[in-house]
Amino acid sequence: MLFWTAFSMALSLRLALARSSIERGSTASDPQGDLLFLLDSSASVSHYEFSRVREFVGQLVATMSFGPGALRASLVHVGSQPHTEFTFDQYSSGQAIQDAIRVAPQRMGDTNTGLALAYAKEQLFAEEAGARPGVPKVLVWVTDGGSSDPVGPPMQELKDLGVTIFIVSTGRGNLLELLAAASAPAEKHLHFVDVDDLPIIARELRGSITDAMQPQQLHASEVLSSGFRLSWPPLLTADSGYYVLELVPSGKLATTRRQQLPGNATSWTWTDLDPDTDYEVSLLPESNVHLLRPQHVRVRTLQEEAGPERIVISHARPRSLRVSWAPALGPDSALGYHVQLGPLQGGSLERVEVPAGQNSTTVQGLTPCTTYLVTVTAAFRSGRQRALSAKACTASGARTRAPQSMRPEAGPREP
């Protein structure tokens, strides 16, 4: 009797441990990751605005959990040269981080955001800056909307490395540029708000940051028309097992793609996919040491990136032109359009931004009886652009010309 009692207890203990291992592999844990704040500290920001931004960032981190096994934070200033206020491993408590933010001085200088983003990329992955391998990376850029140098290429490099980008703009800025820079979807990762109203978005943004830091979820990012990036937490090590990734187009089991990855992998990018298609993705951890459940996510690729194919000029007046184009792309396909007019003989450029879903605009402030090169550029979430150009001439009098389909000067191009 004693033998069966001991055997029953041992069996119950083994079953309990197995259940515990499975549950530990599939339930949520505390957020863990490296959080970098990139603040516009240049002379384009007033001292009052900078003080309000500091208060806002302090409010964001107030209820977050910081420590070696939780979140870590760093602050980098945008100026003529990037400057680190504190590194990821400099402070281990939320209160110490708040105190450091509260006394951070404004650096002034030019707004070289592109330079600061390249610097931030190094900081996010440098162990000497306290960054940790294999944890989620989040960058929060607070800006007045302007930059003295390009931000698109360094932002894309960060996103290609799996960094989640949140942008808070307290000024007007370039809408299309900011939409392309932020992680998708834009409604979750991009905020336009007056500097005095920053506290209004603090709770929502804090929740979004925390969601991005959750380590237990397989998730997709950088979704394009031909592929997307998958990321997951470090569930295994190189010595404890491996992963199998499965990719199944909706309703097409026969075309399942599989990829085996080492146990220390935390990301993979699928390419050569079909546009506007649903894919079921499964991450299967294989290990003799840990019992971990598969993780699943559904991802839909974007529609194909097709730029304008025809430009129509109408209502040609001495100081204005109406520009139309086809096809018209909706918000699901493009971020929007740039319409630019420049005199062929040289002179100032006129530029208009048009939201996705519209395919015409009237450009004002032109010179009478002048030939212009009209360029319509479609901007996509991938950061790519496609453009088409045509010639147009303003009228010498007040007479309106009938619409004419213009022969393109150049085929669709990708700047």
Curated annotation (Swiss-Prot):
Record-listed Phosphoserine modification sites: 74, 80, 93
Positions of the UniProt region annotated as Disordered: 391-415
Swiss-Prot/TrEMBL GO biological process terms: behavioral response to pain; extracellular matrix organization; protein homooligomerization
GO cellular component terms, A-Z: basement membrane; collagen-containing extracellular matrix; extracellular matrix; extracellular region; interstitial matrix
InterPro entries on file: ECM_Assembly_Org (IPR050525), FN3_dom (IPR003961), FN3_sf (IPR036116), Ig-like_fold (IPR013783), VWF_A (IPR002035), vWFA_dom_sf (IPR036465)
Disulfide bond entries: 369-393
Principal subcellular localisation of the protein: secreted
Any GO molecular function: identical protein binding
Glycosylation sites: 264
A Pfam family the protein falls into: fn3
Effect recorded for residue 369 to S: No formation of homomultimers. No formation of homodimers
UniProt keywords, alphabetically: Basement membrane, Disulfide bond, Extracellular matrix, Glycoprotein, Phosphoprotein, Repeat, Secreted, Signal
Domain Fibronectin type-III, chain residue ranges per copy: 214-305, 307-403
Database matches in CDD domains: FN3, vWA_collagen
Signal peptide as annotated in the record: 1-18
Subcellular location: Secreted, Extracellular space, Extracellular matrix, Basement membrane
Tissues where this protein is expressed: Expressed at high levels in the chondrocytes. Detected in the vasculature of neural tissues, in basement membrane structures of the peripheral nervous system, in the apical ectodermal ridge of developing limb buds, and in skeletal and cardiac muscle (at protein level).
Every VWFA domain range: 34-209
PTMs per UniProt: N-glycosylated.
Functional note: Promotes matrix assembly. Involved in the organization of skeletal muscles and in the formation of neuromuscular junctions.
Subunit-structure text: Homodimer or homomultimer; disulfide-linked. Interacts with HSPG2.
Name the record gives this protein: von Willebrand factor A domain-containing protein 1
